[in-house]
């Protein structure tokens, strides 16, 4: 397993719990004589840290492991910035759900030590890249680890659009919007809209209509290498938005085309050896535990 010597730290701003955890993590890493680099925005609120700092974009060039302290939203933002560097990312949960940031603060030293000693799992999670085009010209681009969502923005009106997959017409729909999600994102917004849960190792994309104006509007799972094209109706009287992971937003006009496809670079997500995807689902989604009579 790869040995890590240069460790970057990214954290969610505005939380004293995050800062406390970062201080613990920093001390632990320095005690192991590792080179620690702080993201510059976090460094500004940690006076006297005495460490090298870097912007998030450049962090991937100077580190061989990045640890994210925060919630899943923090890791989503880090993933979009770091995927192009092919650098491993480890998450310490200081948020709510913790689907991606799966190390609890109370087990920080133990689990991080295991990873640094080479005892870890690596998952390659693919991202989506989205582009909004108007009159054959790109007006907005963004990446997403979870999902790309077409929605009406501040309007309460429905959106009319057409869906094409690999150049083939699939259907036209009238709905509150459309969610295009990765397996990683299948347990996020897409799940709330009635989409299926997809195992992270699947090479697939799920397309989930949001409150479609027809009983036949159902989620569809397609090959992960598919290229999706969503054409907004020219007769639409609102300007819908496209959101990537709920963090990057672009405004569309009637007649615009949104293309969504797999991004070439993947996120290398690190887990402790005892990571169990089904246990995560059971814990975070409230699935039932084993029956008391089960012997297995």
UniProtKB/Swiss-Prot annotation:
Source domain of life: Bacteria
Compartments in which it is found: Cytoplasm
Alphabetically ordered keywords of this record: ATP-binding, Cytoplasm, Kinase, NAD, NADP, Nucleotide-binding, Transferase
A Gene Ontology biological process term: NAD metabolic process
One GO term describing the cellular component: cytoplasm
Gene3D superfamilies, per the entry: Probable inorganic polyphosphate/atp-NAD kinase, domain 1, Probable inorganic polyphosphate/atp-NAD kinase, domain 2
Binding of NAD(+), residues: 72-73, 146-147, 157, 174, 176, 187-192, 247
Enzyme class: transferase
Disulfide bonds: none
Single GO MF descriptor: ATP binding
Names of the cofactor(s): a divalent metal cation
Transmembrane segments: none
Principal localisation: cytoplasm
Catalytic activity line of the entry: NAD(+) + ATP = ADP + NADP(+) + H(+)
Record's function text: Involved in the regulation of the intracellular balance of NAD and NADP, and is a key enzyme in the biosynthesis of NADP. Catalyzes specifically the phosphorylation on 2'-hydroxyl of the adenosine moiety of NAD to yield NADP.
Family: Belongs to the NAD kinase family.
PANTHER family assigned to the protein according to its UniProt record, in alphabetical order: NAD KINASE
NCBIfam families attached to this UniProt entry: PRK01231.1
HAMAP family in the cross-refs: NAD_kinase
Official protein name in the record: NAD kinase
Organism of this sequence: Pseudomonas putida (strain ATCC 47054 / DSM 6125 / CFBP 8728 / NCIMB 11950 / KT2440)
């Amino acid at each position: 397993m790869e040995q890590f010597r240069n460790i970057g730290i990214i954290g969610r701003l505005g939380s004293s719990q995050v800062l406390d955890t970062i201080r613990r993590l920093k001390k632990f890493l320095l005690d192991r004589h590792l080179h620690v680099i702080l993201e510059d925005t976090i460094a500004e609120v940690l006076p006297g840290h005495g460490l090298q700092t870097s912007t998030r974009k450049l962090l991937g060039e100077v580190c061989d492991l990045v640890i994210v302290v925060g919630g899943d939203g923090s890791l989503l933002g880090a993933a979009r910035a770091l995927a192009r560097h092919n650098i491993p990312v480890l998450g310490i949960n200081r948020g709510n759900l913790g689907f991606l940031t799966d190390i609890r603060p109370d087990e920080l030293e133990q689990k991080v030590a295991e990873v640094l000693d080479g005892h870890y799992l690596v998952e390659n999670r693919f991202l989506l890249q989205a582009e909004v085009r108007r009159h054959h010209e790109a007006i907005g681009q963004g990446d997403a680890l979870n999902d790309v969502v077409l929605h009406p923005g501040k309007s309460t009106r429905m959106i009319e659009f057409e869906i094409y997959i690999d150049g083939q017409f699939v259907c036209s729909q009238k709905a509150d919007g459309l969610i295009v999600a990765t397996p990683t994102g299948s347990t996020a917004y897409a799940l709330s809209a009635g989409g299926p849960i997809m195992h992270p190792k699947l090479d697939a994309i799920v397309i989930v209509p949001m409150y479609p104006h027809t009983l036949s509007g159902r989620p569809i799972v397609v090959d992960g290498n598919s290229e999706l094209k969503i054409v907004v109706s020219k007769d639409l009287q609102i300007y819908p938005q496209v959101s990537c992971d709920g963090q990057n937003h672009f405004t569309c006009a009637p007649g615009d085309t949104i293309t969504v496809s797999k991004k070439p670079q993947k996120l290398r997500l690190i887990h402790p050896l005892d990571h169990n995807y089904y246990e995560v689902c059971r814990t975070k989604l409230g699935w039932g535990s084993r029956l008391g009579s089960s012997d297995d």
